[in-house]
From Swiss-Prot:
This is Translation machinery-associated protein 16. The gene is tma16. Residues 1-37, 162-196 are annotated as: Disordered. The keyword Metal-binding does not apply. One of its GO terms (molecular function) is preribosome binding. Involved in the biogenesis of the 60S ribosomal subunit in the nucleus. Its main location: nucleus. Associates with pre-60S ribosomal particles. Keywords: Nucleus, Ribosome biogenesis.
Length: 196
């Protein structure tokens, strides 16, 4: 004879809050939250890098086989001024008479903070851009189809404002070599004092 099923519905067991099972479920939930947070942070970082690379790719001169460091610095300067039109439009909206509140204030703040951060990087140890100084890396970058999975194939290089100065601009009078040469010549011309 077949078994008669009871009318009791299966209820989920209530887990005691201090049990090992509750601790395990809490750990799993925290682990999943951490994974989701890291995944979203990585996606945000990749999208920012992707936008930067897309801007550089669209502003490259197609006739150039490679760029000098000075030309790369000029390209970076134009990159740092990419928001100028948008800031002008925001200023124009805010300058209209009769407006008591500033429109697009949060966007304006974000743009100014981004520009300031990138300017500090450029003036400091360098801003990271695709390696357009090397002709082979430039060709790979031009052939890139904006696929983020192929991002590791693109070589990056840090370029700072000091790279825009030519070699002759860096050799300022009074450099270390000149000072050492002057000190050496002064030592030779000094009279020797003999003790008696």
């Amino acid at each position: 004879m077949p078994k008669v099923q009871s009318n009791k519905s299966k209820q989920e067991k209530v887990i005691h809050p201090y049990s090992r099972k509750a601790a395990q479920l809490t750990r799993e939930a925290h682990k999943q939250d951490r994974k989701d947070r890291l995944k979203s942070e990585k996606a945000l970082r990749l999208s920012i890098i992707g936008e930067k690379l897309q801007w550089f790719q669209s502003h490259l001169n197609p006739e150039k086989a490679e760029y000098t460091k000075k030309e790369a610095c000029e390209l970076i300067e134009s990159y740092l001024h990419r928001f100028d039109n948008e800031l002008e439009q925001i200023e124009l909206h805010n300058s209209i008479k009769g407006r008591q509140t500033r429109r697009h204030e949060s966007r304006e703040t974000v743009i100014k903070q981004t520009i300031e951060r990138e300017r500090q990087l450029y003036n400091g140890y360098g801003i990271e851009i695709p390696d357009i100084v090397n002709s082979r890396n430039l060709k790979v970058f031009r052939d890139w189809d904006l696929d983020m999975k192929k991002l590791p194939n693109i070589k990056m290089r840090k370029i700072s404002i000091s790279d825009s100065l030519s070699k002759s601009d860096k050799d300022v009078p009074g450099s270390n070599d000149e000072i050492e040469n002057e000190l050496g010549s002064n030592e030779e011309s000094m009279p020797d004092f003999q003790e008696s």
